[in-house]
Amino acid sequence: PGKASIGNPAAGSMPHLLAGRLAMLGGFQITNVPFAGSGPAIPQVMGGQLAGMSSPLGDWVQHHKSGKIRILATSGPDRAVFTPDVATFREQGFGELMVREWFGFFAPAGISEAVRQNLNTALRQAMGQQDVRDFVTPLAANLEASTSAEHTRRLAEDSEMAKRLVAALGFKADS
């Protein structure tokens, strides 16, 4: 009941927008508290100064597994392999809040097709190496390669979703 202070890693970030939309859909009010990344907010959540946090899963997995915090939901289409005990928003009746976190590699416009293909090949090879996989596992990241076309499509889809969330929330960036 009332307002709860919910942290996010940056004003206007997808976690910020998702928390705002969850509050709208759930019929409750929150005060969004933006941070410079998730790190500074973690002790405040663990200490009870913040009611919660909307941020990337990898920031919280170790604290969830240790019992210091409880992850309430994940935003992916399926339960995360790192937290199979945590239901998705979709499973909890908030299917609209389905977002996959991803990281992409970008290059300057106008690079040659040969350079683009070489970069793509090198990235795919690196992602297949065990030491790279071992490095990202503690970050709760799944390595998944995509083509440039798939990446472009995902970027467009996510941009459209962000536009809808911004409009629904009436979010205005500080100028």
Regions found by a protein language model. Give the residues of each.
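Hinge/capping helix and adjacent helix->loop/strand transition within the periplasmic-binding protein
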Residues: 1-40, 89-91, 102-135
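Alpha-to-beta junction loops
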Residues: 2-4, 26-28, 46-55, 68-70, ...
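Hydrophobic residues within well-ordered alpha-helices
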Residues: 19, 44-46, 64-67
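An extracytoplasmic/periplasmic, membrane-proximal ligand-sensing/linker region
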Residues: 24-28, 113-175
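Short helix-initiation/N-cap motifs at beta->coil->alpha
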Residues: 33-43, 56-59, 149
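Short beta-strand and adjacent tight-turn residues that come in two discontinuous sequence segments
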Residues: 35, 54-56, 74, 99, ...
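C-terminal lobe and pocket-closing loops
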Residues: 60-127, 160
